[in-house]
Amino acid sequence: MKVTFSQLKEAFNQVLLKRGVAAETADACADMFARTTESGVYSHGVNRFPRFIQQLDNGDIIPEAKPQRITSLGAIEQWDAQRSIGNLTAKKMMDRAMELASDHGIGLVALRNANHWMRGGSYGWQAAEKGYIGICWTNSIAVMPPWGAKECRIGTNPLIVAIPSTPITMVDMSMSMFSYGMLEVNRLAGRELPVDGGFDDEGNLTKEPGVIEKNRRILPMGYWKGSGLSIVLDMIATLLSNGSSVAEVTQENSDEYGVSQIFIAIEVDKLIDGATRDAKLQRIMDFITTAERADENVAVRLPGHEFTRLLEENRRDGITVDDSVWAKIQAL
């Protein structure tokens, strides 16, 4: 089915208001969920909203909580999220990283006791739109086996890197081949994954999203490389925030909350003039996109460039929402 941005935001807003969330907070949170969906990231927008409400109902998310600054060391700050709403707090932390970068050239905010930030790419994009390089990542509950194991002991720990090119170039990637949200998107659409995304119960690589969702044997991105990167991202986020590691979140909490996150902004224009910056970025992009195509019908793409097109399409044609997901939201 198709819905408009306004319909989607209003549906989110009403569910939040029904649960006693303050009007201003509910409006801001609903807006972020709707914008994520409008950008084409259904897995962490409309599809994720029922799960978000479940955690709100369980008390994992404290909607009235406000993040507090704990430590300030020039370009580096440490904050405690107080288990506040994840996407609103993440937006504030990237804003703060940009403020620090304006003073120091680079700003780093380490956040502990946070909730799921939904679409991590929103915060990298937020920085790139204002001319900064945006880098951020989060740890999570253990939802992926480390390389060589069958049991989940590491997080998917998504990493985002956004560059202020025209259009914005952005990598937003889980340390698994696919996020669990994308497994759900493909399962709901009745599609196999385009490449192997995990192991079946017999230990064979599989493209069946439902099998991987059930047995949790999701495949690390790049096999042992994604496994290793997940581990070191967790270590850095834990140390800089003095927060919880994947091990602590998994063993000590009843669900995925109280995670650790990193937000970095770099003010490029302190290091290079605007005309030179734009020319260098354009040369990089042109060099890549003019490569001979492996398939004449498929263009060479740069990461994140599809979001501008998806946004235009959804604004023009309406936002596609799975019927079963919409029914869940209407029932909340």
From Swiss-Prot:
The active site is at residue 44. Keywords: Cytoplasm, NAD, Oxidoreductase. One of its GO terms (cellular component) is cytoplasm. Its EC number is 1.1.1.130. InterPro entries: Diketo_gul_Rdtase, Mal/L-sulf/L-lact_DH-like_ah, Mal/L-sulf/L-lact_DH-like_NADP, Mal/L-sulfo/L-lacto_DH-like_sf, Malate/L-lactate_DH-like. NAD(+) binds at residues 168-174, 224-225, 304-306. It is found in: Cytoplasm. GO terms for molecular function: 3-dehydro-L-gulonate 2-dehydrogenase activity; NAD+ binding. It is an enzyme of class 1 (oxidoreductase). It comes from the Bacteria. It catalyses: 3-dehydro-L-gulonate + NAD(+) = 2,3-dioxo-L-gulonate + NADH + H(+); 3-dehydro-L-gulonate + NADP(+) = 2,3-dioxo-L-gulonate + NADPH + H(+). Its main location: cytoplasm. Catalyzes the reduction of 2,3-diketo-L-gulonate in the presence of NADH, to form 3-keto-L-gulonate. Homodimer. Belongs to the LDH2/MDH2 oxidoreductase family. DlgD subfamily. This is 2,3-diketo-L-gulonate reductase. It comes from Klebsiella pneumoniae (strain 342). The gene is dlgD.
